[in-house]
A protein has these predicted regions:
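Structured segments of extracytoplasmic/periplasmic soluble domains
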Residues: 9-19, 36-44, 65-72, 109-119, ...
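Short acidic, glycine/serine/threonine-rich helix-capping segments at coil-helix boundaries
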Residues: 1-66
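Active-site-adjacent substructure of cysteine-protease-like catalytic cores
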Residues: 123-143
């Protein structure tokens, strides 16, 4: 891998809203971004590249996948884009905004759910710990691990039921019952959990 390859990776990451320093080095945040990309890219194998080795090294296959992803508008899967999951806490890059944490199981579950519920609109995906604290999120929020999304129920054709969410592979389900803010929280935490917002 050359400095030019690493610079390409950094520009690509920034096109997704990550905010890496463009220095052509394989530093901590560049490696972390590469690992996340390698782990999540090709869910549903929509481009034919296949699974990538998750090693944080942008080899030829990873670079090819990044170029395809860029040409496809930054898609992480057939129906979802990386930008939909990014931290919305700040437009100014900070240490906490240099990453998009995103678990493969989360995106796979969203693809399965979309098959039965139709188009899905993500209100919130990954949150940096700093942003999560600022909005009053719980300290162990699954959003900070890239395992959770909040969906706009009002923008969907049909209401997602708990049964549909569980069948799609979501273990954490939180349903908003206030009429002024209709969202559903879904996550892929290790232990099944359900709650209602009041």
């Amino acid at each position: 891998m050359t400095n030019a390859d690493l610079t390409e990776v950094q520009y690509f990451a920034n096109s997704l809203g990550v905010g890496l320093t463009i220095d052509g080095r394989n530093g901590y945040f560049t490696r972390r971004f590469c690992k996340m990309f390698q782990d999540t890219f090709q869910i549903g194998d929509y481009s034919g590249v296949g699974r990538l080795v998750v090693d944080g090294i942008p080899g030829p296959k990873t670079l090819e996948a990044m170029r395809i992803c860029k040409a496809e508008g930054g898609r992480v899967s057939r129906h979802f884009h990386y930008k939909e999951f990014r931290n919305k806490g700040s437009l100014t890059p900070t240490v906490s905004n240099h990453v998009i944490r995103l678990e493969r199981e989360l995106v796979e579950g969203l693809e399965r759910l979309r098959k039965v519920a139709g188009p899905i609109h993500i209100a919130s995906g990954y949150r940096s710990p700093v942003h999560n604290r600022a909005i009053g999120g719980v300290s162990n929020s699954q959003h900070t691990y890239g395992r959770a999304v909040d969906l706009h129920r009002s923008r969907m054709r049909s209401n997602v039921t708990e049964a549909q969410a569980r069948a799609a592979g979501f273990s954490g389900v939180g349903i908003e019952s206030r009429s002024n803010n209709s969202v559903i929280h879904l996550d892929v935490r290790p232990t099944p959990t359900r709650w209602y917002y009041r």
